[in-house]
Amino acid sequence: MNKLLLFLLIVFNSTLVFAQRTDSSASKPGKVRNVDGSIMNPSKSIQENILASPNFSTLSSIMREDTTNIFSGTPITVFAPDNKAFSRLPAGTVDTLLLPVHKPDLLNLLKYHAVAGKITSNDIERQIKAGNGRATFTTLSGRTLTAKINENRNIVLTDENGGQSVISRLDVQQSNGILYVITQVLLPKFTP
């Protein structure tokens, strides 16, 4: 009886082990991903996916002011603040940036969220290790962002003003690069 019980226990446990599933869509390029309720199609550009995503409507409104289509070039890595990130800015900030007089600042802000080349989270982590805990990236605006890994193993970006943003979604493959979702808007130093 004990042997039968032991046998059934082993069979049951091994069935549980083999029955577990993981979401492999995050690691396989070419799969459509749901990013916080927004569908990201890897056959579309970063710009196309952001403009079609309700979770990025604030970023979309800013991007519509960009006649150069910064996020449609190839290859790029974009750190995209979602609507929650923009809601953390002081009231009126986005409306002020959308004024015609602030168009250069607006474009600078967009460029500050993009880096040339396809940079995976593994690449970022390797650069952080090689940099003794910090990695510096030059954005399309010519300004820098610093990356580190915090105590919770999250990649944290620090802007030129000391503001920090956690990367909440990693390695969202797009036709022209990689998109990351971030929790705060990164702000470059604005020079008058």
Language-model segments: which ranges?
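Bacterial Sec-dependent N-terminal signal peptides
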Residues: M1-S24
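Mature, structured domains of secreted/extracytosolic soluble proteins
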Residues: F18-P192
